[in-house]
Swiss-Prot record:
Record topology, Cytoplasmic segments: 29-34, 516-521
Species of provenance: Dengue virus type 2 (strain Thailand/TH-36/1958)
InterPro entries named in the record: Env_glycoprot_M_flavivir, Env_glycoprot_M_sf_flavivir, Flav_gly_cen_dom_subdom1, Flavi_E_Ig-like, Flavi_E_Stem/Anchor_dom, Flavi_E_Stem/Anchor_dom_sf, Flavi_Glycoprot_E_cen/dimer, Flavivir/Alphavir_Ig-like_sf
Record bears the keyword Glycoprotein: yes
Chain ranges passing through the membrane: 8-28, 35-49, 495-515, 522-542
Protein name: Genome polyprotein
Pfam families named in the record: Flavi_E_stem (PF21659), Flavi_glycop_C (PF02832), Flavi_glycoprot (PF00869), Flavi_M (PF01004)
Length: 555
């Protein structure tokens, strides 16, 4: 716990950290002594109640298109939360991707039965035998030759013809279906964070709004009761080449298989357009004609091929099914228009009465906390005063996920979600003299979170792919580069310079660039210049974390 406090103190006090390093280097005579002195200085520092520089609140909004548009990536199994100034916090979750009305390419019979077996034979030199069933496509037939003579009804010895037919009926089949990208339907749930009910992405009740996205209607508006309208413009990205893949459906299971493998299966089949279901092609692949004896020939059908197919499909991607529709994975790249959204309760006054904790603070898996409080004072509806402060109660830290929490009526529980900083902090609810002051310690590492966020940013840029880049104009190129730098390096930059003033950040960027330009080593020079330019760019350009944005399109 103390090591975590040291890390937090170092990140918030880069100036004092540099001074400690210089002091340790000056006092110590060996590398071991210098390292020991530096560790001792930083270990003592967190306990000295020195001047603390708090981390400012940030709105993590994906995209660099000003205040109106926000770019997000939705994936199955994940939830995206968007926050913007004076806008409600929204949860977006992609809950379902369905293939509607896939076209049947081919049907295969995997279990059959034989009935109405008939045999006709001829003696030598009497010609080929024939049956009327041979003209019926429902029957499977085979011509053979058999030894004939006096012992089995023929006057001459020699080879005589024999034909056997049996009616082929399929008991169980499997289908191969082709999915067209335009038949995919994406279901998204949009849920505003509300204090009245702790709304999450899968809440489709009072607060959540379910919308459908298809390639034909990629732009959709969602009316959020009490919060206005959000517009979504989405471009589906399944990551699958449906021209080369077929969905093999067997009863209530489905697999994604290669098209050519599916077409080469040695089983009786029907074209997908066949509506009769009886004129099977290659029926003989499931039928065995035994050796004929004079006027008799036995014919048997092979057993069910379902087990063999399950074995052959080992390792194939299994696709889930729901109500006859096929469910896919994949992701959506969406652009949100938030200019028609509004916050509830902006005109309410602050609550001045007493609050009590209904449910103790609970930590979520996302690094946030949820606390349930109840207002016992008068004057509702009103806004809930909520702050997260350092131990000296001088600097506001962390951020509020449930933007502008409000009390609609007295004694009604309200859920509030917030993200405290790593280490010790105070959660303060209400106003003096009846404030709730709750101490909280958040486990984890700021540096570890920095690298984790950087990896998520790089992954997001990879998912966005070519849609993240605009080469149509010079401005588009620079905007795309800015988006990439912000997505990937924004977390490292924020953690490294969280306690440094704007002027000092500019100066550090200039110094790094100047050192790089004057370095004799080519590799070192290029590296330092790139680091300096990225540092300057992330400081000078506003990239949706904090600051002001001017939208020339809305002038």
């Amino acid at each position: 716990k103390h090591a975590q406090r040291i890390e937090t103190w170092i990140l918030r006090h880069p100036g004092f950290t540099i001074m400690a390093a210089i002091l340790a280097y000056t006092i110590g005579t060996t590398h071991f002594q210098r390292a020991l002195i530096f560790i001792l200085l930083t270990a003592v520092a967190p306990s000295m109640t020195m001047r603390c520089i708090g981390i400012s609140n940030r709105d993590f909004v994906e995209g660099v298109s000003g205040g109106s548009w926000v770019d997000i990536v939705l994936e199955h199994g994940s939830c995206v939360t968007t926050m913007a100034k004076n806008k409600p916090t929204l949860d977006f979750e992609l809950i379902k991707t369905e293939a509607k009305q896939p076209v049947t390419l081919r049907k295969y019979c995997i279990e059959a039965k034989l009935t109405n077996t008939t045999t006709e034979s001829r003696c030598p030199i009497q010609g080929e035998p024939s049956l009327n069933e041979e003209q019926d496509k429902r029957f499977v037939c085979k011509h053979s030759m058999v030894d004939r003579g006096w012992g089995n009804g023929c006057g001459l010895f020699g080879k005589g013809g024999i034909v056997t037919c049996a009616m082929f009926t399929c008991k169980k089949n499997m289908k191969g279906k082709v999915v067209q990208p335009e038949n995919l339907e994406y279901t998204i749930v949009i849920t505003p964070h509300s204090g009245e009910e702790h709304a999450v992405g899968n809440d489709t009740g009072k607060h959540g709004k379910e919308i459908k996205i298809t390639p034909q209607s990629s732009i959709t508006e969602a009316e959020l009761t009490g919060y206005g309208t959000v517009t979504m413009e989405c471009s589906p990205r399944t990551g699958l080449d449906f021209n080369e893949m077929v969905l093999l459906q067997m009863e209530n299971k489905a697999w994604l298989v290669h098209r050519q493998w599916f077409l080469d299966l040695p089983l009786p089949w029907l074209p997908g357009a066949d509506t009769q279901g009886s004129n099977w092609i290659q029926k003989e692949t499931l039928v065995t004609f035994k050796n004929p004896h004079a006027k008799k020939q036995d014919v048997v059908v092979l057993g069910s091929q379902e087990g063999a197919m399950h074995t052959a499909l080992t390792g194939a991607t299994e696709i889930q099914m729901s109500s006859g529709n096929l469910l896919f994975t994949g992701h959506l790249k969406c652009r949100l228009r938030m200019d028609k959204l509004q916050l509830k309760g902006m005109s309410y006054s602050m609550c001045t009465g007493k609050f009590k904790v209904v449910k103790e603070i609970a930590e979520t898996q996302h690094g946030t906390i949820v606390i349930r409080v109840q207002y016992e004072g008068d004057g509702s509806p009103c806004k809930i005063p909520f702050e997260i402060m350092d131990l000296e109660k001088r600097h506001v830290l962390g951020r509020l996920i449930t933007v502008n929490p409000i009390v609609t009526e007295k004694d009604s529980p309200v859920n509030i979600e917030a993200e405290p900083p790593f280490g010790d902090s105070y959660i303060i609810i209400g106003v003096e003299p009846e404030q709730l002051k709750l101490n909280w310690f958040k486990k984890g590492s700021s540096i570890g979170q920095m690298f984790e966020t950087t990896m998520r940013g790089a992954k997001r840029m990879a998912i966005l792919g070519d849609t993240a880049w605009d080469f149509g104009s010079l401005g588009g190129v620079f905007t795309s580069i800015g988006k990439a730098l912000h997505q990937v390096f924004g977390a490292i930059y924020g953690a490294a310079f969280s306690g440094v003033s704007w002027t000092m950040k500019i100066l550090i960027g200039v110094i790094i660039t100047w050192i790089g330009m004057n370095s004799r080593s080519t590799s070192l020079s290029v590296s330092l210049v790139l680091v300096g330019i990225v540092t300057l760019y992330l400081e000078v350009m506003v990239q949706a974390d904090s600051g002001c944005v001017v939208s020339w399109k809305n002038k």
